[in-house]
Regions:
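Small-residue-biased structural context
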Residues: 1-140
Length: 140
């Protein structure tokens, strides 16, 4: 289970809110996996996929509007992570493998989220909020 204290905060409240919503969904999926509730897991995984699509799309739109210099790199990481999530959802829908899903939801995804927020989202939020240029942090 992820704890709110584990989520790094960035310079934009809207991004922090989105990350918190994602953490809550991940925790609900973790609970459903522990309970071996296939139907609930399926519904929640679909919700996480939709939330992630909207989350990444919103960030990417802000980056394009503000002409964020490392946009292609950030978008590429979103595409990779979204592809991985789609694969996890497809595998779940085919096999209902609780053990594989538990590893992804309990380890892989939370670790990626924290790392992504600490690096790419922090630089992005700082730029979008006018705090600092990503180029001054070596991201260009």
């Amino acid at each position: 289970m992820m704890r709110q204290e584990e989520l790094p905060m960035v310079a934009m409240a809207s991004m922090n809110d989105t990350h918190l919503e994602e953490m809550i969904l991940i925790n609900k999926i973790s609970e459903a996996v522990v309970q071996k509730d296939e139907e609930k897991v399926t519904v929640l995984l679909d919700a996480l996929l939709q939330h992630t699509i909207e989350h990444f799309g919103g960030e990417e739109e802000m980056m394009r509007q503000k002409r964020f210099p490392p946009y292609p790199m950030h978008k590429g990481e979103h595409d990779r992570a979204l592809g991985e999530l789609r694969n996890v959802v497809a595998l779940w829908n085919e096999q209902h493998d609780f053990a594989s899903l538990a590893r992804y939801i309990g380890e892989t995804l939370p670790q990626w989220i924290v790392q992504h927020i600490r690096t790419m989202d922090t630089a992005t939020a700082n730029f979008l909020a006018g705090v600092v240029s990503p180029c001054s942090q070596g991201h260009c």
